[in-house]
Every structure is written in structure tokens, then in C-alpha cells.
Amino acid sequence: MPKRGKKYLEALKLVDRFKAYPVAEAIELVKKTNVAKFDATVEVAFRLGVDPKKADQQIRGAVVLPHGTGKVARVLVFAKGEKAKEAEAAGADYVGDTEYINKIQQGWFDFDVVVATPDMMGEVGKLGRILGPKGLMPNPKTGTVTFDVTKAVQEIKAGKVEYRVDKAGNIHVPIGKVSFDNEKLAENFATIYEAILKAKPAAAKGTYVKNVTITSTMGPGIKVDPTTVAVAQ
């Protein structure tokens, strides 16, 4: 385990690791325990009662946060003809087809999200082994395989985030920056929490949301009582 700095250890003293804090209080504590010298990202981690090894308990989706994440994503769109023009008009950073497939195969990754029209997926599929492990492969479940490229690009630019359960049953999602107003962080939290509740697989048994933790980059984790989310909104 890496050695923690003095500032981190001081911040840790402010947190009761056995307590699940109300959302509003947890957000305030995240700011107090932030030790980064930059505008740190605030992230929420959900530990879910699902078995990701089972196909009927996979959780994946996307949601537009009302106040964004504080980062404007660079969007690559695979499209041709009119759809390519629509993507450019919507604000996509890169639009094209085979030339970008070749660039990616050569190691180019100056983008954060990939969108593709369905007719391009035959070609984009060649990038599965490259984009898949990085979580960048377009997917209908996250709205990134679509003919409505205008909506897709605009939502991503507005603060759409993807969420996906990992092998351990956890979901990690950024909800903003420590510089955000507390109310905005709370509303973003409420939005992603509601989306994850709606995404509960029918096959999931027992307690669905087992644990929720909020943290800032380099800061300590703070347990959250998600049932207080209505109070925080």
C-alpha cells in the first residue's frame, strides 16, 4: 500500500469511516478533505449486489448529468455523408470513417467518447480489441450507436456520463469538480443514483445498493447514506 502524505492523513481524521453520511454532509466533507492542488474530480462509487459474471446481471448505461462533470469530452464520430455533416454541426471534434480507423490502429487516442452510426459498425467492429478494453467501443445501450448523431454529440458535450459495473460489482462515476456548488454536486449525485436504481436487473437478489462512497481525487473515501438523496436535491 502506498505511503500516504501528511495532508491526506490529516484529512482522514475528519472522516468517521464507520458512519454513512447524509448526501449534503458527505459533499461538504469531500471539499474539506480535498488535498489536491488542482480542481479535483468528485467521484461516486457504488457497490452493488449483482453477479457481473451472469449475463442477466450486467449493468451498463448512460445518463446526462444536469450540471455536467466539469470536463468537456472530445467526441469522435464515425459517420458518412449527411450524418457526418450533422455530427460536425453538432460540435463533434473529429468526424470521419476509415481514416480514423487507421489512425486508431496506429495508436491515436486523442478522444474521450466514440459515436458511430449503425451502418459504420461493420468497420468500427475491427477496433473492438483496441477500443473495448478502454471502454470506448460504441454501444447501443449507452446511445453511442445511433443515426441521431446530433442528439448523441450534444448530450455528450452537455455532460453525459457512462456507467458500467466492473467484475467486482462496482460502478465508478464522476459527478463534477470540487469547485462545483454543493447543490449542483447533490443534483448530479441524485441523477446518477436514480439511473442506477432504474437499471437494477430483475435477476438481482437481496440488497441491490450495498455501499456508496464519495471521494475527490487523492482524497479519502466518505460513505454516503443514499436514502438521504431526496433531502439533498
Curated annotation (Swiss-Prot):
SUPFAM superfamilies: Ribosomal protein L1. InterPro entries: Ribosom_uL1_bac-type (IPR005878), Ribosomal_uL1 (IPR002143), Ribosomal_uL1-like (IPR023674), Ribosomal_uL1/biogenesis (IPR028364), Ribosomal_uL1_3-a/b-sand (IPR016095), Ribosomal_uL1_CS (IPR023673). GO terms for cellular component: large ribosomal subunit. Gene3D superfamilies: 3.30.190.20, 3.40.50.790. One of its GO terms (molecular function) is rRNA binding. Keywords: Repressor, Ribonucleoprotein, Ribosomal protein, RNA-binding, rRNA-binding, Translation regulation, tRNA-binding. GO terms for biological process: regulation of translation; translation. Binds directly to 23S rRNA. The L1 stalk is quite mobile in the ribosome, and is involved in E site tRNA release. Belongs to the universal ribosomal protein uL1 family. Part of the 50S ribosomal subunit. HAMAP family: Ribosomal_uL1_B (MF_01318_B). This is Large ribosomal subunit protein uL1. It comes from Geobacillus thermodenitrificans (strain NG80-2).
